[in-house]
Amino acid sequence: MEPLKHECGVAMIRLLKPLEYYKQKYGTYLYGLNKLYLLMEKQHNRGQEGAGVGCIKMHSPAGSEYVFRERALGSGAIQEIFSSINSQLANVHINEQSNEWVESYAPFIGEVYMGHLRYSTTGRSGLNYVHPFLRRNNWCSRSLMLCGNFNMTNVDEIFNSVVEKGQHPRIYSDTVIILEQLGYALDKENNRLYHEFTEKGLDGIPRALAIEDNIDLRPVLASTAPGWDGGYVICGTLGSGDMWALRDPHGIRPAFYYYDDEVVVVASERPVIQTVFNVPRRAVNELTPGSAIIVNKAGKVSVDDILGMGRNERCSFERIYFSRGSDADIYKERKALGRNLVGKILHELDYDLAHAVFSFIPNTAEVAFIGMAEGLEKHLDRYKADRIMACNAEGTLSRDMIEKIMSQKLRIEKVAIKDIKLRTFIAEGESRNDLAAHVYDVTYGIVENDVDTLVVIDDSIVRGTTLKQSIIKMLDRLHPRKIVIVSSSPQVRYPDYYGIDMSRMGEFCAFRAVVELLKEKGMENRLEEVYNRCLEQENVDDAHLENCVKAIYAPFTDDEISAKIASMLTPDDTSAEVSIVYQSLEGLHEAVPGCPGDWYFSGNYPTPGGIRLVNRAYINYYEGNVDKR
């Protein structure tokens, strides 16, 4: 129930018509900029630590800026950025200027736009880490601006490959290193064309324009991306107007695109494009894993296979939690996740629906709650039909009996309302925990004291901190006999290294529960055995890597681990019995068949880098290096 951080959200727009066209049709030169703002605001859920905007002016004369960038930190970054841009435009009185002047000189009024929303998964903060990143050059075709939703697992290898070429990256981060890698490949492509057109007799401006017109981004991407191990959507643009977005071969990170004769659009989520451009779902395409959508200077759009499509490992957590629930498929999948838990919930209730109250916390779990309620209603309908049939067979069926049977309803209530005004940052330690317990207001009078069971569904339980410090304490104030916490996702057992902020082994309540179970069962030596096996894996080649941490969980059933988690997360002064019900892996894959990536639940990582890092995470845990990721 504690919010997870996710890296990140991307948005790109390429205008395919002259700027004057948008002024005449839409009444403003800010058409592209306004659309970028909406794309970013609609994806604000994907990043609240910072944001950045980039713009390329393709017709800026020599001596004036052609690459614009604005970045800011904090949850209000989008507003800060666009306020700054609007101030700059107000200062030049854009509405009083000619088309030619706007096209040549107006800041942030260009043909290519890039937006980024940041959530850090590395612990690094500051404006230097906010996208887009920029590699400036006074040759337009060599200037490169980059942003992405990605996390690389083999940063050391990529860094070394860059340094071995003689380059000197200023910052040790995957974004900077990839920027330099792509910049090196872009320089090679420029040099190839430089020699080609020099041999054809071109020189000066004609040669520079010929290079811009003929840049081929496919070899630039194909010469660098095969060395990347991770989940990624890498977006880039050149100063000359070329633009691309490349998705990893396994489809771990999401990307969607739309284009017509006016615009090309790329974003992290489908419904965002649908809403902002008012287009039907069928018009928005998913970017094929391993492929790049490329737009050249002339505006020609192509989708090219760069890396080949690997095994489908689309991230299931995107569907459970991160992406907006307004996507048609995601909405259906989240409902299915709730329905698939009905059997376990009924078992916890001993099939007594009359004394059960159902609700959800937080709001992101509402769709799964609807599915759960539909599944329970279906069970209740079957029960009613069976009762009517039984009474009919016994000869006791009457109108009063039918009305009594049919009157049985699920008790669905809004149990908790978040108090958005309450802040806990001024307190520390126990006093902060006490304040955290009051972040939600409870609805009194809906639970029969010491009789009813309170069933509350959440989309995921990762660390369990908020559950222990706030939610269970808050629910216990309603005096239920029992509290059942339901997770629409399976137990989160393993770190993620592809863009979700959960990379420390000791953070997970499932892992902590298993460690306690091993100690209770006298099997503590297994912890050292796994540590030694992980050390051995440090020097194993990629083909023979294995996730040794799986052995930690092997001795116990899912139910045993769930019971231990419930025990650990229940505050000492809780009066009600507490149990936790998790989604099964089978239930997950049945509900979300198109996105089988489940490594944080199963330990089955999609790339060698993930396996290597999970073993390293266990080494750090065992050695007490709690701050290492």
State the predicted function of each range.
Residues 1-288, 294-357, 361-362:
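Conserved short alpha-helical segments that host acidic/polar catalytic motifs at enzyme active sites
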Residues 161, 165, 181-185, 227, ...:
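Generic, well-ordered alpha-helical scaffold segments in large soluble proteins
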Residues 186-191, 342-343, 349-382, 399, ...:
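Hydrophobic alpha-helical segments characteristic of transmembrane helices
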Residues 195-215, 376-396, 401-415, 421:
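Amphipathic alpha-helical
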Residues 224-225, 240-242, 247, 259, ...:
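PRPP-dependent phosphoribosyltransferase catalytic core
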Residues 227-230, 333-354, 367, 372-375, ...:
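Phosphate/ATP-binding catalytic cores across multiple sugar-kinase/actin-like superfamilies
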Residues 299-315, 360-401:
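Terminal amphipathic helices with adjacent charged low-complexity linkers/tails
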Residues 358, 365-372, 376, 412, ...:
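Extended, hydrophobic alpha-helical segments in both membrane/secreted and soluble proteins
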